[in-house]
């Protein structure tokens, strides 16, 4: 299959889509619930990770049933969060949603279990899907989860990666959007702080150092709303190809909290 660069490899998930993903239907929950361990033989008991959140690892690798030789494969390295079953369900549904990078191969699935059946029916021999989730940080009443997918399609030049942050408010049991984290009317100031941080970030890249003008023409700054509130700053995540060549991976630009006084809602600032 020839490689095709999509305009947005995997656009950040909107709040509306997140709400739709978080369906209350138990049939969609494949990382949570009493029978999850039976479905994911690699799961184990819950433990407290370095962020202080109790998580149960869900880890397994499978190839297409009945296939021999070179076979399509799915690898899952995810988590169930014991204290937040609704977040666990959202992780499952959002990871499935993030696989829809190719409109010719997307399907009507809303969970990893449903995606797996779709994948076996449509995948070519060397296709591999990797699905990962981890707690990035736990800060100011938030659980920040990092979702990562990698799709390696038969005949493609290289993989198609995507990352999405979920900032989960424990007290409200919902995802926090970027505009909700800001002081009302301060989006422009936030974007200006992001652009300054981006300016510092790009100076570390060899491509920029070699020819700053050419780099800026090819890879101009653009804002993103894919963010993570962490103890060290606001991490802004970009897709591959968004602001740098593929070799740069999925760039992270960190805005220090010192630049966000009067911009970020004070409840999210340190101290």
Tell what function each PLM region has.
Residues 1-11:
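Bacterial N-terminal signal peptides that target proteins for export
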Residues 17-20:
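C-terminal motif of bacterial Sec signal peptides marking the signal peptidase cleavage site
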Residues 22-271:
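Compositionally biased intrinsically disordered regions enriched in Thr/Gly
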């Amino acid at each position: 299959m020839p490689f095709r660069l999509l305009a947005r490899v995997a656009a950040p998930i909107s709040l509306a889509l997140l709400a739709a993903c978080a369906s209350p239907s138990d049939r969609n929950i494949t990382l949570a619930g009493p029978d999850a361990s039976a479905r994911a033989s690699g799961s184990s008991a819950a433990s407290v990770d370095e962020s202080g959140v109790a998580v149960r690892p869900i880890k397994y690798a499978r190839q297409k049933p009945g296939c021999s030789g070179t076979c399509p494969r799915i690898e899952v390295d995810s988590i169930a969060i014991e204290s937040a079953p609704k977040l666990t369900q959202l992780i499952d549904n959002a990871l499935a949603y993030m696989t829809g990078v190719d409109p010719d191969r997307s399907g009507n699935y809303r969970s990893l279990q449903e995606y797996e059946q779709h994948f076996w029916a449509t995948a070519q021999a060397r296709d591999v899907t990797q699905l990962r989730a981890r707690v990035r940080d736990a800060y100011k009443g938030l659980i920040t989860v990092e979702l990562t997918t990698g799709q390696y399609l038969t005949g493609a030049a290289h993989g198609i990666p995507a990352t999405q942050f979920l900032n989960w408010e424990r007290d409200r049991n919902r995802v926090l959007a970027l505009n909700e984290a800001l002081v009302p009317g301060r989006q422009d100031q936030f974007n200006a702080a992001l652009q300054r941080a981006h300016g510092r970030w790009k100076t570390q890249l060899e491509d920029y150092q070699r020819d700053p003008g050419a780099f800026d023409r090819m890879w101009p700054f653009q804002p993103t709303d894919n963010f993570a509130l962490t103890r060290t700053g606001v991490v802004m995540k970009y897709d591959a190809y968004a602001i740098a060549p593929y070799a740069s991976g999925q760039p992270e630009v960190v805005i220090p909290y010192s630049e966000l006084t009067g911009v970020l809602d004070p409840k999210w600032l340190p101290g």
